[in-house]
Amino acid sequence: MLESEGRLMTRRMAIVVLAATMGVPAFAALKTHDTAPDFSAKASLAGEEFQFSLKSALQKGPVVVYFYPSAFTAGCNIEAHTFSENKEKFDAAGASIIGVSRDSITRLNAFSADPQYCAGKIAVASDPEGTIATSYGLTKMAVRAGMKDSRGVEIDHDFTERTTFVVTPDGKIADVFSTADDKVSPADHVVKSLAAVQALAGHKPSQP
């Protein structure tokens, strides 16, 4: 009898725990003051492939790590263009920028060189399996079947939610903002990240 009651109690406790956790996302994006996971990935700058290392980039100053859904799509085009237009201001604050998406390196070679978007100024890294995004607690969004990019080319990869992390040289996250949680527009990801790196450098924030 006591054994049966014990099993019943165990089942009830399991149900309570399950009910308490239902609806909680499998991942939660990293927050301010968390340690930014190090990563290395194939990347492209001005159409040229190279191996990007966050650890190496941080030795030179803060790094803006911005995740975006896909190259050659409306919001991502705006974001890349705005970053490229303000690259000199990030340079003045001693900060570098790396975009990360699930695009193939072939797509990113074209995107990084396109004068309308990255304009040869912004490096973008390929995260085809979403490994980097997952380490930052970001969720995958399935691409709609037959969806095409702004060039009319079918998109063959899933998306990562648009989220930006500002990482300090000691590997800590100084700021983070997302379109999903904070309703930040693609262009405002640039505005906010620029203000964050200028604050780290002790500069007066400027308007992109």
Which residue stretches match the model-derived regions?
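N-terminal export leaders
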Residues: 9-15
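N-terminal signal peptide c-region/cleavage motif recognized by signal peptidases
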Residues: 23-25
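Chalcogenol-based redox active-site neighborhoods
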Residues: 27-208
